Structures are given as C-alpha cells and as structure tokens.
C-alpha cells in the first residue's frame, strides 16, 4: 500500500470537511487557502455561489505593511484582521470556519484568532 503525499492528505481532509461545511447568507463560510508564500481568506455564500469579501497577502493594502513575505504568522494575523474588518463592514457578524484541509495550527490558527479578535464569531 502506497503512502499519500502531504498534498494528497490535505486534499482528502478538505473533501471530508466540506461534506459538513456550507455557508449560507445568514452564516457564510470563511474559507482559508495557504500556500508556501501567501495566505488567502474569503467569505463565501455557498447558496448564492458568491464571494462576499476577501483578503490576502497579495492585496496592495497589506503588501506595503508586511515586513516579511506573506508566508509568516504575522502576515496571517494581518489577513485575519482585514477579512474580519471587511466582513463586518458588509454586515456579517458570524461565519463558519473552513480551514481548507490544513491542520488548525500555525498560520491557520493565527488567522482564525485574529479574525475572532477583530469581531467575527465562529
């Protein structure tokens, strides 16, 4: 029996999680994607199949303020605060957290904690 690669394990975990996570207009889904150099967060209404707001380390607003590259915990904290600020500005108070198959640790945990500190509930 062959072992799964780390990426395949993440994809398998993500498929398993997505069976139970859906975002509605009342409580949209906060989806997180993590690459080696950047982190992306979107607030998604799955019923309407639309992205309500997003933030990432690629945003010009954040890029100027980041000292390191986008693959650090500090960058994740900044993205979490920004996505929470944008969601609250659109009237979204509560979300369902979708960690995207990643383990709840490190940059994913930093983003989630920052979003909670900024006022999002999940």
Curated annotation (Swiss-Prot):
Region of interest called Disordered, as start-end residue ranges on this chain: 1-26
GO BP field: translation
Pfam families: Ribosomal_L18p
Domain of life: Bacteria
InterPro entries reported for this sequence: Ribosomal_uL18_bac-type, Ribosomal_uL18_bac/euk
Any one cellular-component term (Gene Ontology): cytosolic large ribosomal subunit
Compositional bias per record (Basic residues), positions renumbered to this chain: 1-21
Any GO MF annotation of the entry: 5S rRNA binding
Role, per record: This is one of the proteins that bind and probably mediate the attachment of the 5S RNA into the large ribosomal subunit, where it forms part of the central protuberance.
The protein's assembly and partners: Part of the 50S ribosomal subunit; part of the 5S rRNA/L5/L18/L25 subcomplex. Contacts the 5S and 23S rRNAs.
HAMAP family in alphabetical order: Ribosomal_uL18_B (MF_01337_B)
Homology family: Belongs to the universal ribosomal protein uL18 family.
Name of this protein: Large ribosomal subunit protein uL18
